[in-house]
């Protein structure tokens, strides 16, 4: 990066410091991961210079024959990865992919049913401060207070009560798998579309360690980072393409449009302008990596590690929402420890451990304080951590949280963290 160092030493210094931070610390934020050098190299190329509004073979600009191939590779690999009929790899982020689904399936003011944000849902599933809760009528289902799990009978009752036009599945802090077949039965009963946002679990689904939503849903969205370990971005998928049931037709021929056509139009020109071709190329690289047998092994290790960390925390007296995990994260309810999520997050960060405060079901604290702590295993599993290391991580977390204001303990744990990370190197700081 000599050109950057010479041209803008301040930004070069920022990047170098961030590489150092990632190298030296324990990254336990469940939505974060470490992209490969190949993925990062694809993003830092001349492809960033090219405008390519439209789709391969049907662009609004000339000179797209080369970038067309990059997008075709991304689409082909994504379809192979998820054994699906159609994908759009252009969404800049998961939120943009989600907005295209709303634009396609709903009209402003329509009712949809999603997982309550305070029970593990996501902002784009109906939060009143997000477009999804501003433009549409959001209703919610949640988890049971005793079990921390979704009760499908309660979901059915709620769906019959509110009669949604769409039901959404997916979460940012739900540690269990979803019963897609049961969700589809409920959606069919009330005549609703079923949409799965697999942003958090896309890699685990691709690796075969979680249930597959494709056979049961009308549409699926995802990010391409998180457990999928590609670049930051979004994607929309259809298990099978089908004629849109809303009866929308092509202007000239009068034929019924396919759902894929409506979703393509909802991405561009509906919610975005030009696609980011350097990121789409990086998505193609990430998908190729995820098609390797080693990626399936990685995803199984992610789950094994989360379960090992959760078991050790439970042994040390921590309450886990749903009493464990099926996926990449554990959610700790800290109320029995007399701690807030904010206090825990700050104490751990001082010890070189990055996690995030999080609402827990039936939380009585604000989103800026919270009663919970969310911990994830994808990033450190990428660095080669196994169950033994994650049991050690749980022990260090407990040591810090026993007295979150003890600076000596924080300093000692930070040294221990650095030594552990040195055994599992990530990036060479010289890359910056």
Swiss-Prot record:
The keyword Repeat does not apply. Keywords: Amino-acid biosynthesis, Cytoplasm, One-carbon metabolism, Pyridoxal phosphate, Transferase. GO terms for cellular component: cytosol. The modification N6-(pyridoxal phosphate)lysine is found at residue 226. The record marks 225 as: Plays an important role in substrate specificity. It comes from the Bacteria. One of its GO terms (molecular function) is glycine hydroxymethyltransferase activity. Its cofactor is pyridoxal 5'-phosphate. SUPFAM superfamilies: PLP-dependent transferases. Signal peptide: none annotated. Pfam families: SHMT. It is found in: Cytoplasm. (6S)-5,6,7,8-tetrahydrofolate binds at residues 117, 121-123, 366-368. Its EC number is 2.1.2.1. Pathway: One-carbon metabolism; tetrahydrofolate interconversion; Amino-acid biosynthesis; glycine biosynthesis; glycine from L-serine: step 1/1. The keyword Cytoplasm applies. Coiled coil: none annotated. It catalyses: (6R)-5,10-methylene-5,6,7,8-tetrahydrofolate + glycine + H2O = (6S)-5,6,7,8-tetrahydrofolate + L-serine. GO terms for biological process: glycine biosynthetic process from serine; tetrahydrofolate interconversion. InterPro entries: PyrdxlP-dep_Trfase, PyrdxlP-dep_Trfase_major, PyrdxlP-dep_Trfase_small, Ser_HO-MeTrfase, Ser_HO-MeTrfase-like, Ser_HO-MeTrfase_PLP_BS, SHMT-like_dom. Homodimer. Belongs to the SHMT family. Catalyzes the reversible interconversion of serine and glycine with tetrahydrofolate (THF) serving as the one-carbon carrier. This reaction serves as the major source of one-carbon groups required for the biosynthesis of purines, thymidylate, methionine, and other important biomolecules. Also exhibits THF-independent aldolase activity toward beta-hydroxyamino acids, producing glycine and aldehydes, via a retro-aldol mechanism. This is Serine hydroxymethyltransferase. It comes from Salinibacter ruber (strain DSM 13855 / M31).
